[in-house]
């Protein structure tokens, strides 16, 4: 990522920019009669110990240095790749205190630079050298705004009409008192339990990530085998066969790839440590929950009103549009959170550490600002693609519900194809949005970078993603089961055990899965940064780089 000097020099000369300050005084600080240079290639040779690239004392560029080249990364000036030997290996990696000192917070291990040395590419220098970030894919931001305007028009026209169906507003009056007592009992318990569960899970992930990943996979195997036995006993042979195949592939994947668990565990521990250092990223997740909650209320009101006042083809067309809008807004909110988290992790990766340029003030807010301004068009673009696929799946579901057998079969085929396509696109988009957050590029350019990464690291990406995804999914599943059981028990005095279990499951799942999604985004962001820019980690946090490379060798 640094600037390379393409000028040719004799092999006897010192590396460019690494001569001691006594050899050349900075230009403009000599008497007029002394401002001259020796002929090209005839510099006076002095024996010296070669310094690390990027740590010249009081070095200023000469006229023969090429001008700075434009770079994509717009968050801060990244240090130049180190031209040095690898740091010495770390001993006693199994000690908890050594490991925590490496992966915790804004540290990263290593020897701090000498105070007399000047860091090339400091944070303030990057602010003046690089141009302001450019707005990417702005037309999709405009299209997203126009879609909201159309939603307002459709909703206003629906509420202006008289409903065809009469609803008795007093139907549920006799249950209102019991419902309030039921809610006051369920909500505090669910929120407190969810927060305690998240605290325990993060503690376990920070200190015993490898064991957490292994036991999560054992839980997934047991769950699939349990479903298989249940459906065979129940008589649903086909479902039993499906779950047996799923159990077989999970076991095969674990046996084949279990040697990669230490690397994923290192990434997971590192991600949790960074989240603890910057807890505002968790608050960003709660903000996304609130926005989604408000959006579902607004959308649900519009959807219900449309189905009260319209019938026939008009009702069908408006419903399809509303479903598309539901998916688009939901994915925009979700991907904005992911991009915010990835931006924070990228800032930590490139700027923190003893040899780094230093973290900016409130990096989470800065990352959120970029996601909502310069990168918002790219987020809308990528979210639009997956929303169109999900809308087509909704249409295929309508075909499945058709009475015509041929249409029903075609609907099943389309639904299967679109389901697989949706999973692939969502997987791809997750890493594309990570590139958007790291480099600030457009969605198309980020997609090209993601393709390039997949060409070289697709196997490692899938393995790492599966380990992290399975760990988070099992964590969310265990919490959901506990919440549903406890919620049902608490609701027995109100004769609402079913509703209590369902409500506790819904609210608790939202709180828990939001925190776990932040952990997921953090882990894969560290993975992308490492496989794309390993030399930066070796320069800014050499001992953490040694820890990464000891568990995963980039080939």
From Swiss-Prot:
The chain crosses the membrane at residues 138-158, 182-202, 210-230, 231-251, 284-304, 313-333, 340-360, 372-392, 405-425, 472-492, 493-513. GO terms for cellular component: membrane. Keywords: Glycoprotein, Membrane, Transmembrane, Transmembrane helix. Residues 1-101 are annotated as: Disordered. The keyword Transmembrane applies. Residues 19-63 have a biased composition (Low complexity). It is found in: Membrane. Glycans are attached at residues 116, 174. It is a multi-pass membrane protein. Its main location: membrane. GO terms for biological process: transmembrane transport. It comes from the Eukaryota. Disulfide bonds: none annotated. Residues 79-90 have a biased composition (Pro residues). Residues 1-17 have a biased composition (Polar residues). GO terms for molecular function: transmembrane transporter activity. Belongs to the CTL (choline transporter-like) family. This is CTL-like protein DDB_G0274487.
